[in-house]
C-alpha cells in the first residue's frame, strides 16, 4: 500500500465544480494474485465504515453483475450496473467496482487482468465527504496545479508534461490569473501577441469569413474565448 501524488486531466472541463480536481493524493493498495476480489471488497467496506463514510451505493459492470453482486450481499448497500466500470492504462486493465457517497465516487477496486487487485481511493475526495476539505475555485485549482508542476521541474514545451503545463497556464492567464513568474509571464505575453496578430489579420478582406477552426489551427487562437483575450490587453 502507498500514497501517490496523481495528476488527472480526464475531467479537465469539470474542474472547480466542487468535486473534481487535477492534482490529488491517491491511497493505493495492490495485490498480485494474493488477495481475492471478495477479500478486497470486505477490506474496503470495513475501511469505509471505520472512517464513517459508508457507501450509499456501489457499481459493477453489467458483464460482471451476476458474478460480483453477491460479494456485497452481507452489506446494506445498493448495487448498480454501470458500463463505465472498466479500467485500462492502455496496456493492462480489468473490470472494476466503484464506491459512491453522496453521488461522489470515492474510490474503486480494479480486478486487473482478472487475477490481481488495484485499489485506489482519492484522499481529497474522502476529506471532502467528511467536510474536512475546503472547496476551491477552478482558477485556484489550475494555479496550484501549474505551480506544482513547475516546482517538480516541468518545463514549458510542445510535448508531454511540458504541453500539459502550457495548457494549464494558458487557461490560468485567460481567466485572469495574476501570478507573476517566468512561465506565467511567457504564456501571458504569448497569448497577447496571438490576439494582436488575430485582430490584425482578421480585418483583411482575404481573411474575412474564415471559420473559427482556421484561426485555431493556423495560429492557436480560440475564437470561443475571445472575450477572455480582451481582458489581457
Predicted regions and their residues:
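Structured aminoacyl-transfer and RNA-binding surfaces used for tRNA recognition/handling
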Residues: 1-167, 174-185, 196-206, 210-230
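Short, charge-rich, low-complexity alpha-helical interaction segments
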Residues: 186-190
Amino acid at each position: 500500500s502507498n500514497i501517490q501524488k496523481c495528476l488527472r486531466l480526464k475531467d479537465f472541463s469539470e474542474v472547480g465544480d466542487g468535486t473534481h480536481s487535477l492534482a490529488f493524493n491517491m491511497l493505493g493498495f495492490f495485490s498480485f494474485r494474493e488477495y481475492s476480489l471478495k477479500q478486497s471488497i470486505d477490506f474496503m467496506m470495513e475501511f469505509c465504515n471505520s472512517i464513517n463514510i459508508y457507501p450509499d451505493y456501489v457499481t459493477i459492470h453489467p458483464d460482471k453483475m451476476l458474478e460480483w453482486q453477491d460479494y456485497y450481499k452481507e452489506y446494506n448497500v445498493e448495487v448498480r450496473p454501470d458500463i463505465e466500470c472498466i479500467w485500462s492504462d492502455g496496456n493492462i486493465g480489468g473490470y472494476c467496482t466503484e464506491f459512491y457517497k453522496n453521488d461522489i465516487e470515492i474510490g474503486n477496486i480494479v480486478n486487473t487482468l482478472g487475477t490481481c487487485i488495484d485499489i485506489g481511493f482519492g484522499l481529497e475526495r474522502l476529506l471532502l465527504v467528511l467536510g474536512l476539505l475546503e472547496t476551491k475555485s477552478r482558477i485556484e485549482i489550475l494555479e496550484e496545479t501549474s505551480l506544482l508542476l513547475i516546482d517538480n521541474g516541468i518545463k514549458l514545451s510542445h510535448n508531454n508534461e511540458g504541453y500539459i503545463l502550457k495548457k494549464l497556464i494558458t487557461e490560468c492567464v485567460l481567466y485572469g490569473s495574476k501570478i507573476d513568474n517566468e512561465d506565467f509571464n511567457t504564456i501571458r505575453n504569448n497569448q497577447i501577441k496571438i490576439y494582436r496578430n488575430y485582430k490584425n489579420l482578421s480585418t483583411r478582406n482575404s481573411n474575412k469569413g474564415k471559420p473559427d477552426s482556421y484561426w485555431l489551427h493556423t495560429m492557436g487562437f480560440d475564437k470561443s474565448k475571445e472575450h477572455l483575450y480582451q481582458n489581457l490587453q
